[in-house]
Design a protein with these regions (language model features):
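Conserved catalytic-site region of short-chain dehydrogenase/reductase
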Residues: 89, 124-133, 147, 179-181
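Alpha-helical substrate-binding/gating segment
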Residues: 174-181, 191-212, 220
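Catalytic helix-loop patch of NAD(P)-dependent Rossmann-fold dehydrogenases
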Residues: 97, 131-170
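NAD(P)H-binding glycine-rich loop region in Rossmannoid oxidoreductase-like domains
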Residues: 51, 57, 62-98
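Conserved Rossmann-fold NAD(P)-dependent oxidoreductase catalytic core, especially the SDR/UDP-sugar
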Residues: 105-143
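N-terminal Rossmann NAD(P)H-binding glycine-rich loop of SDR-like oxidoreductase domains
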Residues: 15-37
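Glycine-rich NAD(P)-binding loop of the Rossmann-fold in SDR/ketoreductase-type enzymes
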Residues: 65, 94-105, 113, 124, ...
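Conserved C-terminal active-site "lid" loop/helix of NAD(P)H-dependent oxidoreductases
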Residues: 220-237, 252-276
Length: 277
């Protein structure tokens, strides 16, 4: 029987070698400490400095767009948690290289290495041009709000192809806003606590069957824009909520301009970013 740790995550899960890409990024740094207990070896990659390797860690400085290096990186890996790539909106070319070329390199390397499961960081910005008064499910058409959102929609479609063609299972996580606590009014609906992030990733790694799945990464917030019932088959049960932060956040937020696209659409500020050339 599986045991559960103090954060509500399954602890019986154990891989030989687990790869975490983007390990120097914000969520990567958080998951680096949390995933150690789920594998014999935790292989970490990023283009930025990863510091010193702790016991059981393997450090690799690798650019996602370097196809040969990615193939070497995936050798001997049992499963992948992909947090790498450009994580914000910006000019198209860097997003193209990291989030489109890079995710292709990841999946092709996984195919060659015989990897059977990937947890892929997608984004809520895949559906950012839905209104905040709408409830969206993964079954609804994508409506990306940015080049970044477009790149994440590509990643989901590529993952679908690699499952249908090669049987590589993927859980695509449309992550909301994962921080220690929500920072603004929008995040009251989109917040994903670090503990719930761990619960979600571990659920996706440990579920007996994933197939191809798209789920939203959010905590048990009172106000929600996303129908996440599809995550139930993965065993993800969020335990945190943004509600305890509501009063303090709303007290310091400016009055809402109901005509502001950042207030109208779920993508917030992303719907107004750019053009960049």
């Amino acid at each position: 029987m599986s045991s559960v740790n103090s954060r509500g995550s399954v602890t019986a899960l154990r891989f030989g070698r687990l790869l975490l890409t983007g390990a120097a990024g914000g969520l990567g740094r958080e998951l680096r400490t949390r995933l150690k207990g789920y594998c014999e070896k935790l292989r970490l990659s990023d283009i930025d400095d990863l510091g010193k390797a702790a016991d059981g860690e393997e450090l690799h400085v690798v650019a996602l767009e370097d196809r040969a290096a990615m193939r070497s990186l995936l050798e001997g890996v049992d499963a992948v948690v992909h947090m790498g790539g450009v994580s914000v909106e910006g000019p198209f070319d860097p997003i193209l290289q990291a989030n489109i070329v890079g995710v292709y390199n990841l999946y092709e390397a996984a195919r060659l290495a015989g990897v059977r499961r990937i947890v892929l960081a997608s984004s809520n910005h895949v559906t950012g041009f839905y209104r905040q008064d709408q409830v969206v499910s993964p079954a609804d058409p994508v409506r990306p709000d940015s080049y970044y959102g477009v790149s994440k929609a590509f990643g989901e479609n590529l993952a679908r192809f690699y499952f249908d063609r090669y049987g590589i299972e993927t859980a695509c996580l449309r992550i909301g806003s994962s921080f220690p606590e929500p920072r603004d009014r929008r995040m009251l609906a989109t917040w994903l606590s670090y503990d719930d992030l761990e619960r979600l990733v571990v659920a996706c790694l440990s579920a007996p069957v994933v197939g191809f799945a798209v789920v939203y990464g959010l905590s048990d917030n009172r106000v929600r824009w996303w129908d996440n019932t599809g995550a139930m088959h993965l065993g993800f049960v969020p335990q945190d909520s943004s509600e305890p932060f509501r009063a303090a956040l709303e007290a310091k937020q400016p009055s809402l301009d109901l005509d502001d696209p950042q207030v109208v659409f779920q993508g917030g500020a992303y719907v107004r970013m750019g053009p960049f050339e």
